[in-house]
Amino acid sequence: MTVNINELVKEHGFCVVPTEEKPFSLDEARFNFLAYLEDYPKMGFSFVKVANELVELRRKQEVYRLFGQCFLGAFVIGEEEQVFLLCNQEGREVFQESRVYVNSSLHTFVSSYSLFLSSIFLLKAKFYEMKQDEVEEIAANLKDQVLSLEKPLEQELPFWEHMAYLIEDDGIVLRDDLFHILNKEQ
């Protein structure tokens, strides 16, 4: 995963805290939720794969551990293990916030993100014959499934609601564009 840390520091006023590298234990390897997160570069989703790659960010009393990013900003784990999105410029335009609640835990984020990816692959499976009501059903199912993971629902889930909206509104990138493919060939 490549995140422009300088951009995060400049935009949000964080400082990066150097972390001490620790050996990876067998239990950490067995229960490593980060390893389940698949990158989806078509929409800028990328993640660290092991806990010792987490980057600690501090600002006044706030402490976060950076573990991923997407086209809307950086995914971080807060002090109470909740997942937030620290919004970049595009994310701030969408959410009108600099920080957005995403999920109650990394475990729930992994499940939610996996459901999101499965929705993308459902769209890909029938892209040439899918009707709008089927697309809307995929978006509604994503919202319902993510909401069911967050029982009891403590906060709204604007990030996942926006992902469902993008599915409905044909805002999900399903393939590499021709320009990208041609540039790769040269």
Each language-model region and where it sits:
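A surface-exposed partner-binding patch
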Residues: 1-88, 153-186
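Compact, glycine/acidic-enriched structural inserts
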Residues: 85-127
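Generic preference for well-ordered secondary structure
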Residues: 51, 93, 97-100, 133, ...
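An amphipathic alpha-helical core segment
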Residues: 114, 118-158
